[in-house]
């Protein structure tokens, strides 16, 4: 199947669950097309967490250009809309250079946005975003949720009072635009890549194979700098709800560093959490990505 790629398409899109082998496939196809590998994984954008997010190392990139990897400071929020703006500018540059984009990652929402399935969310001023995040730390999610109830009750009804990140996002949009975030969510977004002009693949290993890869990979991460990454992340004193702090393995390794968990338990619990995450990804792909996405088994 991989030998018969149509040379007339504008891009290749590759997704799949974590540890499925999609990054290796993207690398091979980019090399064949004199292309550039572009990240579509919401955790691999962060600069501090290369090992824990399985971001390709310089050695693994094998000289093929990789973009939108590790370009966001760990303490920064980074939305789907921001990724969409970043990749839009990058794709324009690559077209001018005659380079072929191979876009790969496990964040299905990014691919929906890329092909026009999501609304174009408004840009949020940094001072507004930082102010609301400071309020979240000082006042707590429940108080901000109560504010949202009074200002945007229909949106507040859709959120749990403890979901600080989404509550702050709703308030950000409300403050910046005077409109409910639901107004933007109901609108269809721009089409950055025409889905009819892209070859689209979902890499789906058999479940026992995937689980074995996950188990072995996390053990290897522990030997390859994951502990040092978490130490560096904790030294930043980020808010507990910062996206980078939610990467699988961070909480477990943090517990190990304070003596609450041993290394073997860290590996076991982190691998189990990764398997659950892969299961959620596969459910999302099954429900959200149609038959125009070719399923392949590595």
From Swiss-Prot:
User: What residues bind substrate, as annotated?
Assistant: 18-23
| Residue span of region Interaction with substrate tRNA | 41-44, 165-169
Q: Where does ATP bind?
A: 16-23
Q: Which GO terms describe its biological process?
A: tRNA modification
The subunit field of the Swiss-Prot or TrEMBL record says:
Monomer.
Q: Name one GO molecular function term.
A: tRNA dimethylallyltransferase activity
Coiled-coil annotation reads: none
Q: Does the keyword Lipid metabolism apply?
A: no
Query: Record's family?
Result: Belongs to the IPP transferase family.
- Descriptive protein name: tRNA dimethylallyltransferase
Q: Which organism is it from?
A: Agrobacterium fabrum (strain C58 / ATCC 33970) (Agrobacterium tumefaciens (strain C58))
The gene is miaA
Tell me its EC number(s), please.
Answer: 2.5.1.75
Q: Can you state which reaction this protein catalyses?
A: adenosine(37) in tRNA + dimethylallyl diphosphate = N(6)-dimethylallyladenosine(37) in tRNA + diphosphate
HAMAP family annotated for this entry?
Answer: IPP_trans
Entries under InterPro entries matching the protein: Dimethylallyltransferase, IPT, P-loop_NTPase
- UniProt-listed Gene3D superfamilies: 1.10.20.140, P-loop containing nucleotide triphosphate hydrolases (3.40.50.300)
Q: Which UniProt keyword terms apply here?
A: ATP-binding, Magnesium, Nucleotide-binding, Transferase, tRNA processing, Virulence
């Amino acid at each position: 199947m991989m030998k018969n790629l149509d040379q007339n398409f504008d891009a290749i899109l590759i997704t799949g669950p974590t540890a499925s082998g999609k990054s290796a496939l993207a690398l091979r196809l980019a090399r064949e097309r004199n292309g550039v590998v572009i990240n579509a994984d919401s955790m691999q954008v962060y600069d501090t967490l290369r090992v824990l997010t399985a971001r390709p190392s310089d050695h693994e990139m094998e000289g093929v250009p990789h973009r939108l990897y590790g370009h966001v400071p760990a303490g920064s929020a980074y939305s789907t809309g921001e990724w969409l703006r970043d990749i839009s500018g990058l794709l324009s540059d690559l077209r001018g250079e005659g380079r072929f984009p191979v876009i790969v990652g496990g964040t299905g929402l990014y691919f929906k946005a890329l092909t026009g399935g999501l609304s174009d969310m408004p840009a949020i001023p940094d001072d507004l975003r930082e102010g609301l995040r400071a309020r979240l730390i000082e006042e707590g999610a429940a108080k901000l949720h109560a504010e949202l109830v009074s200002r945007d009750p229909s949106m507040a009804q859709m959120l749990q009072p403890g979901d600080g990140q989404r509550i702050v996002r709703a308030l950000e949009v409300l403050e910046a635009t005077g409109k409910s975030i639901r107004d933007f969510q109901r609108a269809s977004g721009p089409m950055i890549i025409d889905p009819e002009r892209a070859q689209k693949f979902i890499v789906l290993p058999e479940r026992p194979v995937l689980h074995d890869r996950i188990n072995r990979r996390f053990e290897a991460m522990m030997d390859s700098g994951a502990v040092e990454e978490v130490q560096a992340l904790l030294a930043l004193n980020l808010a507990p709800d910062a996206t980078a702090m939610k990467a699988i393995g961070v909480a477990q390794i943090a517990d190990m560093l304070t003596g609450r968990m041993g290394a073997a338990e860290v590996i076991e619990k982190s691998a189990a959490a990764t398997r659950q995450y892969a299961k959620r990804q596969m459910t999302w792909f099954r429900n959200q990505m149609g038959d125009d996405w070719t399923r392949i088994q590595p």
